[in-house]
């Protein structure tokens, strides 16, 4: 069981350190293009990826980079940096440039595409876990901890909250209250691999 809270994880150095341990599969770009709402594609789709990223500074060779817009900046501004760090494909809501040096997939909703690809890459761990989400203004952490301890006597559980991420066999500090979907899928995959059957999140 894995506990997921309303304030979930994003990625810190501690979370990024788990990337190599996470059980993710390799996906072909053609497979990705078929499972998301594509507007157009550019370049070769006969390329496999095993890592997805929304921060150009954390791109590693072979990454799929999602260019996501935000309140203060826009991921499209950092496509060149992502390419310099080894990205092999970009997924964005913006049209592909006329001379992109790498593959490019334009979608209607980049965040929806990120969610769909993340679930696919990490083997849809949410389908194999009993998930409990705890929301509210105050008391989420307390309720989550109590719930985990109550159910923990019957099954191995995981907890993803504002204080830390308990993955069943280890505890790491949480960096942010709300995680991006690819980090959440990665953590759920790790919890599942560690033998958890339930997850609590607040």
Where are these regions (language model features)?
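N-terminal leader/targeting and accessory segments in enzymes
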Residues: 1-116, 120
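Phosphate-binding loop of NTP-binding sites
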Residues: 114-202
């Amino acid at each position: 069981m894995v506990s997921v809270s309303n304030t979930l994880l994003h990625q810190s150095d501690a979370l990024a350190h788990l990337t190599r341990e996470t059980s993710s599969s390799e996906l072909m770009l053609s497979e990705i293009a078929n499972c998301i709402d594509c507007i157009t594609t550019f370049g070769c789709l006969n390329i496999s990826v095993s890592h997805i990223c929304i921060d150009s500074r954390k791109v590693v060779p072979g990454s799929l980079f999602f260019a996501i817009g935000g309140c203060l900046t826009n991921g499209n501004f950092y496509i060149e940096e992502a390419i310099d760090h080894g990205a092999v494909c970009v997924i964005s809501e913006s049209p592909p440039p006329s001379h992109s040096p790498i593959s490019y997939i334009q979608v209607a909703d980049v965040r929806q595409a990120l969610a769909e690809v993340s679930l696919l890459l990490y083997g849809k761990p949410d389908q194999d876990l009993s998930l409990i989400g705890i929301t509210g203004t105050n008391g989420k952490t307390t309720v989550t901890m109590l719930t985990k301890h109550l159910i923990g006597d019957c099954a191995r559980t995981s907890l993803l909250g504002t204080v830390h991420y308990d993955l069943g066999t280890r505890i790491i500090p949480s960096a942010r209250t709300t995680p991006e979907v690819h980090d959440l899928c990665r953590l759920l995959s790790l919890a599942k691999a560690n033998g958890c059957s339930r997850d609590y999140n607040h």
